[in-house]
Amino acid sequence: YKVTMTKLELCETGSTTANCLNPLTISPSGTSGEVDIASVSAGAVAGSYGNIAKAKIGTLYTFIQITMSRQFSMTGTAGSCATKAGETGSKTADAKGQTGGTPGSSTLYVPDSNSYNDHMNGSVDALGASVSNDGVIGSSDEYFQYRKIISGGGLKVKAGDFPTVRVAFDVSNAVGEGTGGAAACTANVMYANEPGMTISFVD
């Protein structure tokens, strides 16, 4: 399950799932970070993409906002279907799957929808300069923003004390299928679901 992050921001206290208040970019300018979030080292790799030293001393941050590509490289199963090696979907079409067998690597997309929860919204560009409404990922959006609360009451950086980012992923429901039965698995039915994620900071 490979995801490409293009921007990582800290959100100040008062932020919600729908709003990153006074966002502070802590990722490198003009660079992206690909993470295989199914690997055991995923949390460390994702965490290293952000530089906590950029945080304001004494400011409480309670959410993180991640901008990432809608395109994922995925291997897995959903319902009666499995991903098929070499298959590629698009923003407007799911990828073809297979019934049973060993899952192969497919290119899947987070689908267009106006009914996501408010912690997600689409973005035309990689830096979130032009975004859709909360809960909406539209046909012109190449990326999406994802807001997640920071566990343990948030992050407040002290002078000379920069904690380590810990990101725990759950990809058990990362692959989605839109069939309703094994007979349709070979059609265009495979898409990307959002992964489960827990974000914390440790000294």
Which positions does each model-derived feature cover?
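A short, solvent-exposed, low-complexity linear motif enriched for acidic/polar residues
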Residues: 1-203
